[in-house]
């Protein structure tokens, strides 16, 4: 029966959990992103294991008999195992020009957290991308008045943005939440209390998305992504949709956020010239092998640019992710299998990869 390497993080309705820590009656996600209970677990040591690499940067280590639902190139869907795919090779054609095995990309997931968020998700997204906090104000750098006005309406109290001279920097003078009729500005302590310490912004290279936002409701996560994309997202002529910033952790957090919304994406690095030095930037490329990317923007100029491209290139959406490499490890590895309360016997593993549980029946051929 198939199993996954211990230590692999499994997304659950309350956050990620190492697979070996999951218990009967705990919940994971099925392939549609809905919570589903665990009926059984088992752990054992396997003499060999296999690491599968996917084209969008995801990877996972499994036992040799781990079962997969695969769409084979130029063929229908089949059921196969990690060992079978390794033995036959993942590339096909005379010159090995294409990848033979593809898995269906995950759907958006539904976390169970109902905790109130201290800052509106859209505003937080803009702040993480283009904002900073001072002693008595929040500043956002943007050439798009649309973004500034939207943030103004979503602040704890709608307040008028002020521009720093002839620059593109706009600041909001946040007033104390305890004296609504007072003109006294909040102190730095109160500002940190309002935004919560982990959200106060300092260096852009150190920004990250707080955990409560990554496991918030579908609507909140989408609003957060929209704030980040309206501020630091780009749509290129070739149809690429990119999020760019200088924080590695923010890039990884954004990648997790996007994948939880049902998008396929991967991270690239780029050294951006800055006077005499080169600043390392992180680019998250959101591929067309995923959901409707137009939902990620509300800023009209970016949204219309993407809609214009999608309208001219009405290529059928391909929500499948190719397996590009499989590596075998000939050493003992502890693995854990799950039995899921689902008719399809599927759940989402690390990075929301759809995978079969240990009870799925295996047979070669079409299903």
Where are these regions (language model features)?
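A short beta-strand micro-motif
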Residues: 8-13, 28, 50-53, 284
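Intein-associated homing endonuclease modules of the LAGLIDADG/DOD-type, together
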Residues: 1, 24-34, 39-276, 319-367
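Polar, glycine-rich mid-to-C-terminal structural blocks
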Residues: 280-313
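Extended catalytic core of nucleotide-activated donor transferases of GT-like folds
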Residues: 315-317
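Intrinsically disordered/low-complexity terminal segments and short unstructured peptides
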Residues: 7, 79-80, 276, 286, ...
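Protein maturation boundaries and topogenic segments
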Residues: 1-23
């Amino acid at each position: 029966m198939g199993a996954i390497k211990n230590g692999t993080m499994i997304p659950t309705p309350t956050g990620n959990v190492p697979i070996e820590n999951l218990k009967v009656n705990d919940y994971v996600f099925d392939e549609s992103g809905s919570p589903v209970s665990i009926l059984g677990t088992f752990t054992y040591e396997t003499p060999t294991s296999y690491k599968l690499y996917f084209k969008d940067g995801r990877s996972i280590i499994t036992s040799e008999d781990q079962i997969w639902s695969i769409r084979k190139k130029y063929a229908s869907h089949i059921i196969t195992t990690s060992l079978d795919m390794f033995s036959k090779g993942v590339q096909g054609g005379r010159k090995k020009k294409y990848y033979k095995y593809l898995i269906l990309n995950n759907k958006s997931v539904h976390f169970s957290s109902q905790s109130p968020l201290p800052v509106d998700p859209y505003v937080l997204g803009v702040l993480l991308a283009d904002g900073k906090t001072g002693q008595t104000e929040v500043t956002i750098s943007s050439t798009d008045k649309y973004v500034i006005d939207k943030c103004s309406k979503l602040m704890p109290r709608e307040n008028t943005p002020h521009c720093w001279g002839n620059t593109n920097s706009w600041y909001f003078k946040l007033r104390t939440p305890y004296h609504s009729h007072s003109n006294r500005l909040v102190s730095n302590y109160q500002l940190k209390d309002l935004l919560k310490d982990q959200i106060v912004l300092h260096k852009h290279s150190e920004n990250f998305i707080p955990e409560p936002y990554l496991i918030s409701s579908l609507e909140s996560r989408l609003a957060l992504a929209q704030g980040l994309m309206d501020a630091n997202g780009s749509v290129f002529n070739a149809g690429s949709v990119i999020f760019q910033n200088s924080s590695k952790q923010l890039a990884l957090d954004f990648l997790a956020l996007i994948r939880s919304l049902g998008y396929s994406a991967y991270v690239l690095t780029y050294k951006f010239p800055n006077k005499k030095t080169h600043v390392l930037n992180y680019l998250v490329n959101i591929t067309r092998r995923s959901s409707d990317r137009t939902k990620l923007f509300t800023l009209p100029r970016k949204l219309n640019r993407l809609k214009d491209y999608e309208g001219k290139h009405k290529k059928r959406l391909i929500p499948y992710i190719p397996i590009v490499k499989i590596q075998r490890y000939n050493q003992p590895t502890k693995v854990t299998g799950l039995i899921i309360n689902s008719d399809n016997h599927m759940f989402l593993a690390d990075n929301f990869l759809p995978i079969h549980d240990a009870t799925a029946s295996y047979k070669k051929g079409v299903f």
